[in-house]
């Protein structure tokens, strides 16, 4: 992937507009989870160190486009940045017709989704964004799969359009895992439905050596292999699809599972051999023997891609499978990449973030990249680099 990189540019005295993903949860006017802001900070600091006049933009939530809403304001993010950087970070609401920023200064623009035409990627709005800067930096991998005014349109019209360090690192890590992975490669794909991850499963089946499935997805594969799944969540209409995938790649199946009679925090967990699953059982995790088997497979892998917990880990009695695999990935010498919202929550819960080679900040963008789809915001940066 050939894109201009912000790290290679001379930014001294330049007006630099950086698109970050600062779409963080806010509770009572305070940032509730700062992971995305922390991921963006090095880029912002680097632009300031390079002597740029720095303008940062992002979306937050899903406001009605073109209308201000206090609950979707980036004010809590501006407050957080001021504290984190030890300097005043003004939140600018009216910026489309120009804003005064000096070299070494930093401002945060109000939610881009308050601007009409943002989601439709309107040229008129994109040209206004582009006119604000000498250099546009796309650093928000989490929104790279969306062609919007502040992610794609502005890159079309800006004098210079480059990838920020965070975006560049995501693309490098994903390329390393998917374009020419060190072998053997194992992928863990879990979730409630095969239908939502079908493209991911198909794409990975052609690059990985072991495809470990979990959650409702695993139940569909178990049913395809003729095993009882009781009243577990599965998709009978996709049994043939599961068979076709299993014919292309090794899909190791659970030999034991953790079941319950109901889906609840107070539900009693019972370990059963797969053949003993009763008609009124719900499979909510992989069993200890299966977890040990899968951990052994991961130990011998050189590349690991992890998307999704293998059980209902939010309830501790159904979290052991995910915990064992998380620890196995952490202990492995393989290049490991993890992505997707629930996966990040599991990484947090089991404290393995430092041992995973790369944790992707993008949910939908991560999955679309794995599916082999073109990410519009990356494609436009490549086009501009060629020109």
Swiss-Prot record:
InterPro entries: Phosphoglycerate_kinase, Phosphoglycerate_kinase_CS, Phosphoglycerate_kinase_N, Phosphoglycerate_kinase_sf. Substrate binds at residues 21-23, 36, 59-62, 113, 146. It holds the Pfam family PGK. It catalyses: (2R)-3-phosphoglycerate + ATP = (2R)-3-phospho-glyceroyl phosphate + ADP. It comes from the Bacteria. Its main location: cytoplasm. The gene is pgk. Transmembrane segments: none annotated. Belongs to the phosphoglycerate kinase family. GO terms for molecular function: ADP binding; ATP binding; phosphoglycerate kinase activity. It is an enzyme of class 2 (transferase). It is found in: Cytoplasm. The keyword Cytoplasm applies. This is Phosphoglycerate kinase.
């Amino acid at each position: 992937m050939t894109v201009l990189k912000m790290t290679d540019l001379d930014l001294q005295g330049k007006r630099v507009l950086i698109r970050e993903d600062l779409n963080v949860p806010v509770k009572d006017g305070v940032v509730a989870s700062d992971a995305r802001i922390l991921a963006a900070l090095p880029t912002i600091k680097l632009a300031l160190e390079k002597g740029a006049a720095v303008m940062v933009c992002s979306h937050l939530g899903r406001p009605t486009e073109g209308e201000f809403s206090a609950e979707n304001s980036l004010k809590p993010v501006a407050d957080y940045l001021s504290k984190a950087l030890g300097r005043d970070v003004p939140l600018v609401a009216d910026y489309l017709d120009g804003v005064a920023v000096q070299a070494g200064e930093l401002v945060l623009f109000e939610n881009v989704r308050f601007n009409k035409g943002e989601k439709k990627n309107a040229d008129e709005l994109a040209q206004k964004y582009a006119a604000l800067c000498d250099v546009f930096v796309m650093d928000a991998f989490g929104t790279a799969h969306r062609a919007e005014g502040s992610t794609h349109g502005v890159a079309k019209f800006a004098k210079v359009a480059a990838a920020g360090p965070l975006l560049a690192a995501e693309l490098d890590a994903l390329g390393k895992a998917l374009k020419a992975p060190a072998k053997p490669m194992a992928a863990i794909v879990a979730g409630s439905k095969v239908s939502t991850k079908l493209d991911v499963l198909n794409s990975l089946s052609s690059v990985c050596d072991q495809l470990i499935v979990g959650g409702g997805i695993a139940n569909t594969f178990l049913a395809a292999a003729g095993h009882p799944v009781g009243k577990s969540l599965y998709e009978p209409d996709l049994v043939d699809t599961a068979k076709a995938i299993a014919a292309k790649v090794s899909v190791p199946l659970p030999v034991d599972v953790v079941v319950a009679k109901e889906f609840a925090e107070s539900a009693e967990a019972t370990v059963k051999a797969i053949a003993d699953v009763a008609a009124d059982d719900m499979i909510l995790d992989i069993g200890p023997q299966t977890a040990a088997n899968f951990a052994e497979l991961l130990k011998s892998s050189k590349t690991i891609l992890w998307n999704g917990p293998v059980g209902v880990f939010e309830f501790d009695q159904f979290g052991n499978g995910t915990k064992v695999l998380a620890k196995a990935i952490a202990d492995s010498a393989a290049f490991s990449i993890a992505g997707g919202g629930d996966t990040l929550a599991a990484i947090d819960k089991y404290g393995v973030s430092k041992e995973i080679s790369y944790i992707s900040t993008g949910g939908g963008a991560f999955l679309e990249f794995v599916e082999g789809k073109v990410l519009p915001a990356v494609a436009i940066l490549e086009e501009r680099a060629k020109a």
